[in-house]
């Protein structure tokens, strides 16, 4: 045997022993790794654990022993779990002081709470879309009869069920991936304190969509409740009943929710008109679609760790019904919902890389005109 090198040389390396290729989003994933040293077993080693570039913990590993690790998969799609240890003085190389595992995040069925106000022409549009998606578990309530309504109907002749407000908005609110208020106005059905809970839910990472109609401009608007802390725009009180073609703004032409929307490339757009816009002032976030007189039509905003969307018209059902040829309501509504629930494919800023043989294909999704060059760092650190 021919042995090269010096007997005094030393090196440490880290590797994954067990790294599943798939994991459920938001759930812990069990993995196993090992730190190996040419000096045999030694003192415990600090191991930095990062997920998608963000350090999530520091583990203490015994050299030479298999170590258990539990990480939470944050996103659907590809996730990168990286382990790293510091270089020791005199080590041959630190190129093997890192280990990487690729984990594809898979969502369990998405839980969506849809709360509809009084019945209207487009009430079933959101319901039908969500019910048709096999990956969505939908909980839908329509407020047909508020508690303050008194018309003499005997209780034993009412066939309606009570709205389980405490169960939905206190006990189980964290279980929902998305809450939709479809033309909902404040009623005594929902105690005023519960709007605070919804705002807190958004701040901590939840998703909220307001599909607004004339009620948003009225005296019982949910903008007049503590929920206003989570809303991207306040109503002016105006309801503009005027025909218009929904159009993408300059920002909307680049935003992944609306970019390339079927029919948007022509002028006027190749879809039907709508006939109502709800006026708002001081919109925050991103205005990606505009309505009558260039008023904001679709707003997308971030609040704390969560996201909020606001559709300022109740006319989307015209696309669903095929009026004047209809429009891409399924494509638009689905993208809105999935952006709110942080689908990686719809992130405004996204960088991905895929290897094909000896070629590396880099893709960047960006809202800026000139994203600039990409920096590639090889395993050698260069």
Put a short name on every predicted segment:
Residues 1-382:
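N-linked glycosylation sequons
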